[in-house]
A protein has these predicted regions:
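Short, Lys/Arg-enriched N-terminal segments with co-localized hydrophobic residues
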Residues: 11-29
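Domain-level signal for soluble alpha/beta catalytic cores
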Residues: 23-422
Length: 422
């Protein structure tokens, strides 16, 4: 069960006022589509096999060559940033190459995070599985076999076992250094770096210490504040990955009503706003999704229900799924929404779970729907979610197809630009 179903930290609604204590040094505002539609994606990209082998050794506690790992990681980031620029992506990142996943990487940075062994004697609650997959156990079995993984079947599962604090900046500094060097070499239009939201960690790093979800979320927010501010101070746009505002409804909180879930979402937004209180909104974006897997998705909470809560988050940009068959229609639902003038929409216009390569004209049509709602300058073309969310999962989209999709995204943005600036 969740905690007290109340915001642990007061919510704030963004206004265009620079907060006191704002990080000035190194900060950049998110680029707008002032004279053409800009392109980006969500973060994770296919990791090179040799890097995967080193990552697996590190995660499982086996001996590995740390110098070889650092050297290969730096080279891989150089390569992947250059590939993004060559594909026509404007706002690039490090592909999350040095992270095991977008959430559990925190065990290398936060104190109080221990591990337990996953498996038959320590299974997670049924709510760890998506509700739509529980409706279709035959498909769930097929999906797990295809991924070569089942829920919590990895050897090492992180959990909160003590007071949470940011204790080791070295992995963060390595990521910042590698992305800085890669961007210096190829000079992209913009670069961003991912970080987990406080709320999403309550699912992927289960609490065994605080025994109160509100207290745990607040502790995570206080700890992650250091990472968030460091990313922005280094000159990158901060992307906070917050599927706790979407997919958590049909897994972690599937036993609750929509109204109860939205109160939890409000609490998580309040924690996120607290953690980013020293960062200008225009230096941040937030990613919302409903689970990066091909499946029925019949229990996804509609965007229309969670959108107003998302608008109360401080980050100026909102990245969200808008290409897959369960959410591609939802642009219609935003036409009647009050969207603050300074919010930037980053709809997914390519699907991250299928090997179909979208036609550039379809991508342009999707971009046009959102440009009609908020204006062309406030739309950036993105992807639904990451292409390599978990390092050791057999991700559905083949690496060569990932790059074909990103090239199609760039071409679709050019087609949309020709239409919108004609």
């Amino acid at each position: 069960m969740p905690g007290r179903l109340r915001p642990a930290i007061p919510c704030t609604i963004w206004r265009r006022v620079k907060p006191s204590g704002t990080q000035e040094e190194g900060t950049h505002e998110m680029k707008l589509s002032t004279d053409r539609i800009l392109t980006t994606h969500v973060g994770s990209l296919p990791r090179p096999p040799e890097l995967l082998a080193l990552l697996e050794a590190r995660e499982t506690g086996r001996e590995f060559d740390k110098t070889a790992f650092e050297t290969r990681l730096a080279g891989a980031v150089q390569e992947i940033v250059a590939k993004q620029v060559a594909a026509g992506i404007d706002s690039v990142c490090d592909g999350e190459l040095g992270k095991i996943s977008y959430t559990t990487y925190v065990r290398h940075r936060l104190s109080g995070i221990g591990t337990f062994r996953g498996g038959d004697d320590d299974k997670p609650p049924q709510s760890a599985a998506h509700r739509d997959l529980l409706d279709h156990p035959d498909y769930m079995q097929r999906l797990n076999e295809a991924r070569r993984i089942s829920w919590f079947s990895r050897e090492v599962v992180p959990c909160c076992a003590g007071p949470v604090a940011y204790s080791d900046r070295r992995p963060l500094e390595t990521d910042l250094k590698n992305l800085t060097a890669a961007c210096t070499a190829v000079k992209p239009v913009e670069a961003f770096m991912n970080a987990a939201s406080p709320g999403v960690l309550t699912k992927f790093v289960p609490d065994r210490y605080y025994q109160d979800e509100d207290a745990y979320v607040e502790a995570l927010a206080n700890a992650l504040k250091e990472e968030y501010e460091a990313v922005v101070k280094a000159g990158f746009i901060l992307q906070i990955d917050a599927p706790d505002l979407g997919s958590a409804r049909h897994n972690q909180y599937q036993h609750l009503s929509d109204e109860e879930f939205l109160r939890i979402a409000e609490r998580n937004i309040a924690a996120l706003n607290h953690a980013t209180s020293n960062i200008p909104p225009e230096a941040m974006r937030m990613h919302l999704c409903w689970g990066n897997y091909e499946g029925p998705h019949t229990h996804d909470i509609p965007l229309a229900k969670t959108f107003d809560v998302c608008m109360r988050a401080r980050p100026a940009g909102l990245s969200f799924e808008a290409a897959n068959p369960r959410h591609a229609h939802e642009w219609e639902d935003l036409r009647g929404k009050k969207i603050p003038d300074d919010k930037i929409l980053i709809p997914g216009v390519i699907d991250s779970t299928t090997n179909f390569v979208e036609h550039p004209r379809l991508i342009a049509q999707r971009i046009g729907h959102y440009a009609d709602i908020v204006g062309r300058e406030r739309v950036i073309a993105g992807a639904d979610c990451g292409f390599a969310t978990f390092a050791f999962v057999n991700n559905p989209v083949a690496p060569s197809v990932v790059w074909a999709k990103l090239a199609a995204l760039a071409e679709g943005a050019r087609v949309a630009t020709a239409r919108l600036w004609n």
